[in-house]
From Swiss-Prot:
CDD domains, per the entry: Cytochrom_C3
Role this protein plays: Flavocytochrome that catalyzes the reduction of fumarate to succinate. Is essential for fumarate respiration during anaerobic growth, acting as the terminal reductase. Receives electrons from the membrane-bound tetraheme c-type cytochrome CymA. In vitro, can use the artificial electron donor methyl viologen.
Induction annotation: By anaerobiosis and fumarate.
Protein name per UniProt: Fumarate reductase (cytochrome)
UniProt-annotated binding residues for heme c 2: H8, C36, C39, H40, Y94
UniProt cross-references to InterPro entries, sorted A to Z: FAD-dep_OxRdtase_2_FAD-bd, FAD-oxidoreductase_2, FAD/NAD-bd_sf, Flavocytochrome_c, Multihaem_cyt_sf, Succ_DH/fumarate_Rdtase_cat_sf, Tetrahaem_cytochrome, Znf_C2H2_type
Keywords noted in UniProt: Electron transport, FAD, Flavoprotein, Heme, Iron, Metal-binding, Oxidoreductase, Periplasm, Transport
GO cellular component: a single term: outer membrane-bounded periplasmic space
EC number: 1.3.2.4
Quaternary assembly: Monomer.
Length: 571
């Protein structure tokens, strides 16, 4: 057998997988996945049977209910979705190497006969609001719109939910929260505003930053009320105080937040359609939104009538061709992003008349693991890890802003550096155990041994850590002016993760106002069109601070949902 269908048909009939009429159930393949589970068990049950494997692919870090067909195809060779981000060697039966041959929005515009046939037909569905993208912004918008009385469809072009949000690890920035007060952390929306503007080199839109900072506490409260654990509060680069909220023990915030959002969307019976791509925002003769043309992977083109459309499609950091055109210095860089982050939403918005801004500002995350392609959260540094070069020397304030940290790493021998930490840092942040499990964090019982393993000058490394520990004891980093010195590195084993910058966040995007309404080049609102999250520009300026992305997507997602629902009621 060359594929799963050929294998299954040796012992079973077609209707073991398919509906009796042979038609695919929907673009989410709901029926087909139910049949998979009926034979093989749930993802959790399968993960238990494969736990002996070095990389247990079924023990997924993805939120939501990951469908079997996210990786396993039937009538063609399968592709391991993990390989879209990582470079692990999975040996899956009937599989081929990961590839993404997805036509662009412009290329799809050439499907004129199919598109015109769909548009000439009656709408497939009629709702109040369509949300495009199932990341943190999309789910927040869908839930918020639903709670405001709107009927909502949420579409997602990938086979898995979560967008980039599911990969976020550091925290959710918010000011003057109950969690901060409980830890006696003094903060304010004004200070968060100042930090965000400074981090963005004051290119940010102050009005949008004010929305972000002044509503950040409400966003944390909103998530907490829905079941999120955001009790741990850490520090991220560019912040004056600890304001990065995350789960107890320092677990990754993104997957947790998306899981909470997903669970709440399910409770509200929100219509979620996977493998479904937003193609064109439809407008009437007056330029007002009347719906959206979509393309299902299996069902093809159809249109949905809606009063409002919310674009929450993320950025374009995975599209290196587009990145390099805007910033040639990033040509050939790998990305920390999920495979869908190629800029579809920007094309859809532009075709609808939306203006783009700040497109030239593209951020590299300083710590992408050289082995495995795993983004290592900034919280590792925030909790005490140091950065050293191959010569075993520190060379930068570890929790400076990402642009400065990335530039400093690229200036080192080999254009990479090493995160060095001990068991005390590991115990403070449960996310680190994931890196160890993935094999990207070698360990040794001495710094000399660790240096030998990783090609670092062990003698110099030992001296560097001793020097750093003395600075921790003194309470002041006179070498690089690191503002926080949470702990000495002298407990148990030592760890090293080789890291290099990877394209991480695209600060530019669709121009929006303080109601999340998309605007044209004349700064006029396009009635019924909204944007939230990384698809938009103006919030972060020239550089995004760690922890501000989750805050951004939740805050503006909520806002877009509320405003779209209000707009729908009026129309």
């Amino acid at each position: 057998a060359d594929n799963l269908a050929e294998f299954h048909v040796q012992n079973q009939e077609c209707d073991s997988c398919h509906t009796p009429d042979g038609e695919l159930s929907n673009d989410s393949l709901t029926y087909e996945n139910t049949q998979c589970v009926s034979c093989h068990g749930t993802l959790e049950e399968v993960a238990e049977t494969t736990k002996h494997e070095h990389y247990n692919a079924h023990a997924s870090h993805f939120p939501g209910e990951v469908a079997c067909t996210s990786c396993h195809s039937a009538h063609e060779k399968s592709m391991v979705y993990c390989d879209s981000c990582h470079s692990f060697d999975f040996n899956m039966p009937y599989a081929k190497k990961w590839q993404r041959d997805e036509p662009t929005i412009a290329e799809l515009a050439k499907d004129k006969s199919e598109r015109q046939a769909a548009l000439a037909s009656a709408p497939h569905d009629t709702v109040d609001v369509v949300v495009v993208g199932s990341g943190g912004a999309g789910f927040s918008a869908a839930i918020s719109a639903t709670d405001s009385g709107a009927k909502v469809i949420l579409i997602e072009k990938e086979p898995v939910i979560g967008g980039n949000a599911k990969l976020a690890a550091g925290g959710m920035n918010a000011a003057w929260t109950d969690q901060q007060k409980a830890k006696k952390i003094t903060d304010s929306p004004e200070l968060m505003f100042e930090d965000t503007m400074k981090g963005g080199q004051n290119i940010n839109d102050p009005a949008l930053v004010k929305v972000l900072s002044s509503h950040s506490k409400d966003s944390v409260d909103w998530m907490t009320a829905m079941g999120a654990d955001l009790t741990d509060v850490g520090m991220m680069g560019g912040a004056s105080v600890n304001r990065a909220h995350r789960p107890t023990g320092g677990a990754g915030v993104g997957a947790h937040v998306v899981q909470v959002l997903y669970d709440n969307a399910v409770k509200r019976n929100i219509d979620l359609r996977m493998n479904t791509r937003g193609i064109e925002v439809l407008k009437d003769d007056k330029g007002t939104v009347k719906g959206i043309l979509v393309k299902g992977m299996y069902k093809g083109y159809y249109w949905v009538k809606a009063d409002a459309v919310i674009l929450a499609t993320g950025g374009f950091a995975k599209n290196n061709e587009r990145v390099a055109k805007l910033d040639p210095s990033l040509k050939g860089f790998i990305s920390t992003n999920q495979p869908g982050a190629v800029g579809d939403g920007l094309d859809v918005a532009e075709n609808a008349g939306g203006a783009l801004k700040d497109m030239q500002y593209i951020q590299a995350h300083p710590t992408l693991s050289v082995k495995g392609g795993v983004m290592v959260t900034e919280a590792v540094r925030g909790n005490g890890a140091i950065l050293v070069n191959r010569e075993g020397k520190r060379f930068v304030n570890e929790i400076t802003t990402r642009d400065k940290a990335s530039a400093a790493i690229l200036a080192q021998t080999g254009k990479s550096a090493y995160l060095i930490f001990d068991d005390s840092v590991r115990k403070s942040l449960s996310k680190i155990d994931k890196y160890i499990g993935l094999g990207v964090a070698p360990t040794a019982d001495s710094l000399v041994k660790l240096g030998k393993m990783e090609g670092i000058d062990g003698k110099a490394l030992t001296e560097t850590v001793a020097r750093y520990n003395s600075l921790v004891s003194s309470g002041k980093d006179t070498d690089f002016e690191r503002p926080n010195l949470p702990r000495a590195l002298n407990e148990g084993n030592y760890y090293a993760i080789e890291v290099t910058p990877g394209v991480h966040h695209t600060m530019g995007g669709v121009m929006i106002d303080t109601k999340a309404e998309v605007m044209n080049a004349k700064k006029q609102v396009i009635p019924g069109l909204y944007g939230a999250g990384e698809v938009t520009g103006g919030v972060h300026g020239a550089n995004r601070l760690g922890g501000n992305a989750i805050s951004d997507i939740i805050t503006f997602g909520r806002l877009a949902g509320e405003e779209a629902a209000k707009y729908s009621k009026k129309n």
